[in-house]
A protein has these predicted regions:
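Mature catalytic domains of secreted/periplasmic carbohydrate-active enzymes
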Residues: 23-541
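N-terminal export signals
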Residues: 5-25
Length: 541
């Protein structure tokens, strides 16, 4: 059946059931496919509702940690180390040797995680306000960070000799956090972007034409540390970009199934997207394109995951699928991912964005130059996101040994101090009728890190609600000790109730306030109770 006509007109439940039965035993999954209310089609997935725990949580920490953190040279090391002339290639040759002799598999071998204390880290994250932890399961490098059944190049067999994902899951849940995984090894990103460079060679220099180690086979490992392991299972069979990859797609699906079945994640995050393109000649019916590699791959994963999650939680759906580049026709089927970007308006459905205080993989240069993003950026970022019905997943990148550096510890401590005072206005809240007021509300299409360009002041206000209580965050401290909230003017349409009490969270004394025709005027103490964003609790009469 034509996908366009299906999406436009829908199908009867009988037809859907027949199609679900036909695909239910798809070659992509092994064993019994969980039955449930969700069928592997976008139309069926429209009945999804985001669970309340995710809407309440607001903030999570992302353990974006893999062998690529070992060189401490930032993100995409597993690709750029094979690109002659790149900064990471030059570092690699100087530090480890030429990639024909010392390749990415050898970087994986160096990952020991010898100073990793997951329980201590999770306690730090929880103190900083995290309600969930997301572990990187597989990056574009094609290395699995768990005891993978379908990839021998994994963290139990190579490197740390530990189940990284499983350990994070156990420790997070023991500390009362929800747990999720992020999966980046999709066909589009891994097969097309990361693996093909491993089969190339230098174009100039003394080793020009000598193939990189991506061309090695199991027979080349005799007498070496990786003897008996086939490097082509890590690097893929030699191929060029845009080469069909049915075997890799099959393995991708089995690995996703494995991580779902093994750890029952509360969040399933993909560093990829599901995008529609409207090329039907103007009729408005979508021609489905799924970036994960083949059409209809994403809905098969989602139906499997949602139904499995319902079984795990005794009939309740507690799972969240997080995808980027999602266009409007399927917004309600999942949780939209805005990676490093902000929504510029209040969103009807819950959403999430990811941000990082440094590079996605650890960078020694950023630490040594004290160049991390500061709490002065990330705290207003969190408040802005929550006011628009979103969540923030924040990465604090770990070095390969697993111990955060001193600047990261200082960041977490400052965030924890702020959360101790202000989390009441964040956790468990819902958006108000409007998300905010002030000059920064007019900024459109902003990238998260660009917030540092804007100097927030006390006229930049963000709102959240919890029950009858309204919270108003001022993103700056007033020089004249007065905050004016125009949206709460006595004549404003948004808040018609009488105000009984106004409190400044963390303040040692009560604040004075008056509600006037031009706004709610609050006189604040000389010294702020915290830094970066200041929360007023407004209770109705």
């Amino acid at each position: 059946m034509n996908r366009r006509s299906f999406f436009k007109g829908g199908l009867s439940m009988i037809a859907l059931a027949r199609m679900a039965h036909a695909l239910g035993d798809s070659q992509f999954f092994q064993g019994e496919v969980p039955r449930g209310p969700f069928l592997p089609f976008w139309e069926s997935l429209k009945s999804y509702r985001c669970p309340d725990w995710f809407r309440d949580a607001k903030f999570g920490i992302w353990a974006h940690w893999s062998p690529q953190c070992v060189p401490e040279q930032g993100d995409w090391y597993a690709r750029n180390m094979y690109i002659q002339g790149s900064r990471q290639y030059e570092f690699h040759v100087k530090q480890y040797g030429h990639p024909s002799q010392f390749g990415y598999k050898d970087i994986c071998h160096l990952w020991k995680a010898e100073r990793w204390d997951p329980d201590a880290l999770v306690k730090l994250y929880k103190r900083a306000g995290a309600e969930y932890l997301v572990s990187l399961a597989t990056h574009h490098d094609n290395f699995d960070c768990w005891n993978s059944k379908h990839q021998v190049w994994n963290a139990v067999n190579v490197g740390p000799k530990r189940d990284i994902v499983g350990t994070w899951a156990k420790v997070a849940r023991a500390n009362g956090l929800r747990f999720g995984v992020s999966y980046h090894g999709t066909p589009h990103r891994t097969w097309d972007e990361f693996l093909p460079v491993r089969y190339k060679s230098d174009s100039t220099g003394p080793l020009a034409g000598v193939p990189y180690d991506g061309m090695q086979t199991i027979s080349d490992g005799k007498g070496k540390w990786w003897a008996g392991m086939d490097p082509q299972l890590l690097n893929g069979k030699p191929h060029k970009k845009n080469t069909p990859c049915p075997e890799f797609v099959q393995q991708f699906m089995l690995r996703v199934q494995d991580v779902i079945d093994s750890y029952s994640p509360d969040i399933l995050n993909f560093d990829d997207g599901a995008r529609f393109t409207f090329d039907d000649g103007g009729t408005g019916a979508p021609d489905l394109k799924v970036w994960l590699g083949i059409p209809d791959l994403a809905p098969q994963i989602m139906a499997y995951y949602y139904n499995k999650n319902i079984q795990t939680h005794s009939g309740r759906l507690e799972g969240v699928v997080d995808l980027k580049e999602v266009d409007e026709p399927i917004w309600g089927t999942l949780t939209r991912d805005f990676e490093a970007n902000l929504a510029d308006s209040l969103q009807e459905n819950p959403w999430q964005t990811e941000a990082c205080i440094g590079g996605w993989h650890y960078s020694r240069w950023l630490f040594e130059n004290h160049a991390y993003q500061k709490p002065s950026l990330m705290i207003p970022l969190l408040v802005d996101i929550v006011s628009k019905n979103g969540n923030l997943l924040l990465s604090i990148p770990l070095p390969g040994h697993g111990e955060p550096d001193s600047d990261e510890l200082a960041f977490l401590d400052e965030l924890a101090q702020w959360q101790e005072i202000n989390s009441e206005g964040i956790k468990g809240t819902r958006p108000w009728k409007i998300f905010g007021e002030g000059p920064s509300t007019e900024v459109k299409g902003i990238v998260a890190y660009q917030l540092s360009k804007y100097k927030f002041d006390s006229t930049d206000i963000r709102f959240t609600t919890k029950g009858d209580v309204l919270y108003a965050f001022a993103l700056g401290w007033p020089s004249d000790n007065q905050v004016l909230i125009k949206s709460l003017a006595s004549t404003a349409p948004h808040y018609e109730r009488q105000i009984r009490k106004v409190e400044l969270l963390g303040a040692k004394s009560a604040v004075k306030w008056t509600r006037e025709p031009d706004g709610l005027r609050i006189r604040v103490p000389q010294d702020p109770p915290c830094h970066h964003a200041y929360c007023f609790k407004i209770s109705p009469a």
